[in-house]
Design a protein with these regions (language model features):
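Conserved ABC ATPase signature
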Residues: 82-90
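GG-anchored amphipathic helix commonly corresponding to the ABC/SMC/Rad50 NBD signature/C-loop
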Residues: 89-108
Length: 157
C-alpha cells in the first residue's frame, strides 16, 4: 500500500530547502513511485540521438509538442540544435517540456539555479509559476539558497 502524501495534491510553485529532510524525503518517495519527474542541471539524454529524437523518444504519451513549446518559452529551432550547442537554460527548458509532455503532476527542480545566469533565473521563476497554474501541476524548487523562498513566485514549504 502506498504511503499517502500531502504533496501529491498541491498545485503551484514551491520552494523546499535542500536541508528540509521531511519534505525532501516525501519528494523522493514521489520519485520512487513514478509520480514525479526530476529536472537536473545536466539533461540525461541518450547521447547518440539528436535533441529532437530524444524529445520524441520521451514523448511516449504522444502529446502535441508544438502546443507545449510556447509555455516553456522554447522555439522549435532549439530542438534542431546539436546537443553540444544547447545552453544550460535550454536544457532546463527541454526537461520542463518533457515533464509536461509526460503528464506527471509533480515536477522537482533540484540544484539547477547555479548553472544559470541571473537573468535566466529571473526568467525561470515566473515561468515555473505560470506553468504550474496553466498545467495544474506542482513544481518544487529544491535548493540550498533560501533567498529563492522569498520571491513573489514561490511558496515556501
Amino acid at each position: 500500500m502506498e504511503k499517502p502524501t500531502q504533496l501529491t495534491k498541491s498545485i503551484g510553485f514551491f520552494y523546499v530547502a535542500k536541508d528540509n529532510e521531511a519534505k525532501t524525503s516525501e519528494l523522493s518517495l514521489l520519485l520512487s513511485q513514478k509520480k514525479a519527474i526530476l529536472i537536473r542541471a545536466q539533461w540525461p539524454s541518450v547521447p547518440f540521438l539528436s535533441v529532437m529524437d530524444n524529445v520524441s523518444l520521451a514523448n511516449k504519451k504522444g502529446g502535441d509538442l508544438e502546443d507545449v513549446l510556447p509555455y516553456v518559452q522554447l522555439p522549435l529551432s532549439a530542438l534542431k540544435k546539436d546537443r553540444t550547442e544547447l545552453t544550460p537554460f535550454e536544457e532546463l527548458k527541454i526537461q520542463l517540456l518533457l515533464a509536461l509532455l509526460s503528464e506527471r503532476e509533480t515536477l522537482l527542480i533540484e540544484n539547477v539555479l547555479s548553472t544559470l545566469t541571473t537573468k535566466e533565473v529571473q526568467t525561470l521563476l515566473p515561468l515555473c509559476q505560470e506553468i504550474a497554474e496553466q498545467f495544474a501541476v506542482a513544481i518544487y524548487l529544491i535548493h540550498e539558497d533560501e533567498c529563492f523562498a522569498h520571491t513573489p513566485y514561490t511558496t515556501y514549504l
